Amino acid sequence: VTDATTPSRHALSDIILASAQCLTAVHEGRSLSDVLAQTPPTLKGATQAVSFHVMRHLGQALEVKHMLVAKTPPVPLLDAVLQVSLCLLDTAMVAEQLTREGKPVRPDWPVYAVHTVVDQAVSAVAGHRRMQSFKALVNGVLRRFTREREAILTRARGNPEARWNHPNWWVRRLRQAYPDHWKAVLSAAQLPPPMTLRVNTRKRTVTQFLADLGAAGINAHAVQLEGIAQGADAAVVLEHPRPVQDIPGFAQGWWSVQDAAAQLAAPLLGVQSGMRVLDACAAPGGKTAHLLELADLDLVALDADASRLARVGQNLERLGLASSHVKLTAADASRLDTWWDGQPFDAILADVPCTASGVVRRHPDILWLRREADIARTAALQRKIVKALWKTLKPGGRFLYVTCSVFPQEGESQAQWILEQYPDAVRLDAPGQLLPLPVDGQAAAHDGFFFALFAKQAAVDNNNAS
């Protein structure tokens, strides 16, 4: 998903209203991507750009709104219109100042003139039956912000949620876990990610694909996270994100969209042709495909969501990797009786469900959908899945535990638990916790991930590990 601004035939008032509807849905616990999927096509691009931007700055918008509006508006949509408009207004004022100083404005920002934001926000409520009577409120709040912005923001940023645009509990946990890096991790989440591709080396070399891109006028470069995994050398980063249909070779299966850190998983397992491999929690299939690009495998791709598993099959077809040796199975990984045939696996990739706290720059609504209690809930689910999967690994086999989380309770704590739970588990070299840290103010090269690799020893009494 890219949140690059897309030209729209709609007035800004329409975009503000659509973005406010998205924000209201997120406040109600719905996924932003699900709501955007229902947005009219001509309005979707601009609404997505604004909605993503608001999600990345929602902590400040919420605090400022609370300061300027004594009582929560009786109409939830009006409350969201104020949050969206205050965010756009602040961005407009910052952009004006940068322009006056001759400094560049971030290309991913949805920038409109200050007077346009105020006028169109008022128009948005004026054209809506349930909000018409609040035109003066919206106008007054926004105009006050333009007059008193500096003083208002100074007060607002006394609240860590407004300062860092993360829930307070999230800030606290990262500060405790990473005293030297928590600020950088929080800052990185507010920068849109680069568009990173994984070259299908069965069809193109990285050099060939870079030449393909160059011929199409697309600037890109190869990237490798040094010294982490042999074979993790197929990542290419585009200078500017663009629709997949505009990139050479999509239909031909030359490449897939996949973050650089996610591309480490398959090489870490060290698979070889002929192995029997399980990709648990496989959807949407990026790591499944990568495994098959590396070797000819007897592979089971497992996922509890049948509709998402269907996407795995579609991806494998596009990449030319579908075969009779690849089995897609819709089942709960923790319930062996529903899917396992009793034949052990040589290698298991357990990319288990998590809070997704490491990918919030891609899905900023996660920040406002998650609750602190979700960490313990997902950690319990992760252990339930690992307990089942370990039984299916043959002695001498490899087990890779993966999450896209930055919370240690879903990462290192789980790795230590595996060692305590299973006397036959031996920990091997793997990256451990990868934090998404910005470089020189630019987006981090990769998302937040955790990797722990284990080998299963033979002839160890494991009766107590159940």
Whereabouts are the PLM-identified features?
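S-adenosylmethionine
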Residues: V1-S466
